[in-house]
Regions:
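A short, N-terminal "cap"/entry segment at the start of jelly-roll beta-barrel domains
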Residues: 1-18, 26-30, 106-109, 131
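N-terminal regulatory/effector-sensing and dimerization cores
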Residues: 16-106
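Solvent-exposed, amphipathic alpha-helical segments
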Residues: 45, 117-128, 176-184, 228, ...
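Aromatic/histidine-rich interaction motifs
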Residues: 98-123
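Short, Lys/Arg-enriched, Trp-marked, Pro/Gly-tolerant hinge/linker segments that flank
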Residues: 108-116, 129-144, 148-187, 191-198, ...
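Terminal helix-turn-helix DNA-binding modules in bacterial transcription factors
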Residues: 179, 183, 187-193, 200, ...
Length: 277
């Protein structure tokens, strides 16, 4: 079976930065940071989580809590003994427009017992957090990045994402078409060919794609192409080369599609992102 996550991580980087390894006692607030979410591991102790939801979240067993996008949240624990945490900032390249960050709900909480596939990397991560070996910080950071891939695998395997790209990648038929789009965005993709990738008729494929992913295949492909174009612009590549790589005939065609998607020309977007010299 084709690797459903390979193109996502190949094109759009994710970086973790560990910032907490130990107890948090009483009330601890985390303000949103532009372009970064957080991945928290609660090893032991009870936690009340306040993050703007109608009801507060109670964690009473070892759990992971992922915020893929910036969101203010507050932990309330026993003021004397607290709860044991290991936490990392998670920076998705492109921020909230990163395909994975955009595809996930505002927060995900999973008991560690519900993600048995993560047991080995969690054991390594917790052991490293308790030790003082040289290279501890980069080791923890890389282990958090590996853990994030495991979490995505588990979310897809358990069907916990109900709509959007990850739901499409979890679908037994649609995932073949999505992987094909991700792997060859420069190609023209007639509806008939995508339907064949999914083993469906044109009508059934189009309706299923829209219901599960939330857009038409054409709109999805354009969004994926523009995301790749933005990555190329962040890397300082020439627009004409980007256009060829993502399936547009030239700079003018890419600029039109870019403006239709973002409301800005590529030059305006680079300036707004602080990428102009």
């Amino acid at each position: 079976m084709a690797d459903r996550l390979a193109a996502l991580f190949a094109h759009f980087a994710v970086r973790a930065e560990t910032f907490q390894t130990g107890p948090l006692c009483g009330v601890n607030s985390l303000e949103p940071q532009a372009g970064r979410g957080q991945l928290h591991l609660v090893r032991d102790g009870g936690v009340e989580v306040h993050h703007g939801a109608p009801e507060l979240l109670r964690i009473d067993e070892p759990s992971l809590l992922l915020y893929p996008r910036p969101l203010a949240h507050r932990f309330v624990t026993d003021p004397s003994c607290g709860a044991q945490f290991v936490c990392a900032h998670v920076a998705f390249e492109g921020g909230a427009s990163h395909p994975i960050a955009a595809a996930l709900p505002p927060w995900v909480c999973l008991p560690l017992a519900a993600v048995p596939g993560c047991a080995r990397v969690l054991g390594q991560l917790f052991a490293e957090a308790e030790a003082s070996h040289c290279g501890r910080q980069p080791m923890l950071d890389r282990l958090f990045e590996v853990l994030l891939i495991w979490v995505l695998r588990e979310l897809m395997a358990q069907g916990r994402v109900q709509s959007g790209m990850l739901a499409g990648l979890s679908h037994p038929r649609l995932r073949g078409a999505l992987v094909a789009l991700h792997d060859a965005p420069q190609r023209e993709w007639p509806l008939e060919e995508l339907a064949a990738q999914a083993g469906m008729s044109r009508t059934v494929f189009a309706n299923t794609f829209r219901d599960v992913v939330g857009s038409t295949p054409g709109v999805y492909l354009q969004r994926w192409r523009i995301g790749l174009a933005q990555k190329g612009l962040r890397e300082g590549r020439a627009l004409k080369h980007i256009a060829a790589d993502v399936g547009y005939g030239g700079e003018a065609a890419l600029s039109r599609a870019f403006r239709a998607h973002t409301g800005q020309s590529p030059r305006e977007w680079r300036k707004a992102e602080g990428l102009m010299n």
